[in-house]
Amino acid sequence: MHEIPVYRQPFGSSHTSASGATQPVDEHILKLYMRKELGRSFPFAARPRAGQIVQSIADMAHGVHDYSPISGPTKPMDMADAVRKGMNKFEFYKPRDWDNGKDTEEYHKFKEIIPEMAQHAVNGIREFYGDTKFEGEFQRWHQDELIDVPTMLFQDYTGGGRQVDLKCSFPTRNPLKKDGTRSWRFPKPRTEPTPQQIMQQAVYWKATGDEPGLLFVTPLGFNIVDASNCDALKPHALEESYQQVRQRWLVIQNLLRAAEGKWSNLFALVQPDYGQIVGRHGPDILAIAKQIWRLDR
């Protein structure tokens, strides 16, 4: 177990992550406070939860669910059984109640299309690896020489010196029609990764040396993006992206050090974006944010 620097301990900041580097600084600080002082996390939404379910079904179908590098893969599950188990998990999700029914509506729509998307994911993983054996998701660590805590990472699938991350895009709502009904827009699989996705891949590449890949899945199919069709996933570009990630980690590190163990000092160093916070996390989290940022006064 690594030793946490003294200045980080009051904030419960024991590690960095790839996702943490792509998160706005104010939300990162808010997340630390909620976890350390309130024992809470940001509320979930139907969209990311549905993505987890798609991956869970794909994992079971390929025999890499609940993966352990010690015991290795298990027997692949029949697709129908995998879908059934995955959908049972999704039934436990409770939609948000503060967005005028948006999350509830999306939850019910996603229930209709998860099985189809999971099949696309299974097919895409199979195409990416072919006969190559691969591992499922488990906790890994990376130590950057300029950062005084390790980086925790979870790669979706790795094998044969290559890794691929599953990225799901779900339908979005169109405006209500005059008769009160609504249609949905079904996106095509992406052909280019977002800057945040490139940063995440850069961390994985730096930590493991695995060639990065992204498997984009929608209800319409899948598309695989890697260095063969995307310059942003080639080594020179990944190195540039990694340096951006490192710089963001350093910003957080310097802020925590400058705060001298006091939340009030930390809040005074960071300007909150209340509009982004309420839009992403709802009025309850906004109320917490407004309360804690008063501590800097």
Q: What would you call each of these model-derived segments?
A:
Residues 31-38, 168, 220-226:
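Short acidic (Asp/Glu) and glycine-rich catalytic loops that position anionic groups and cofactors
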Residues 31, 62, 172-175, 207:
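Active-site-proximal flexible loops/turns
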Residues 49-56, 199-207:
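Short amphipathic alpha-helical face segments that pack within enzyme cores
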Residues 130, 159-162, 207-211:
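Short glycine/proline-enriched coil/turn segments at helix->beta-strand junctions
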Residues 203-297:
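Metal-dependent nuclease catalytic regions and adjoining charged, substrate-binding loops involved
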Residues 1-154, 295:
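Metal-dependent nuclease catalytic cores that hydrolyze phosphodiester bonds in DNA/RNA
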Residues 47, 190-194, 235-238:
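Flexible, glycine- and charge-enriched loops at secondary-structure boundaries
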Residues 140-200:
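Non-catalytic protein-protein interaction segments used by genome-maintenance enzymes to assemble
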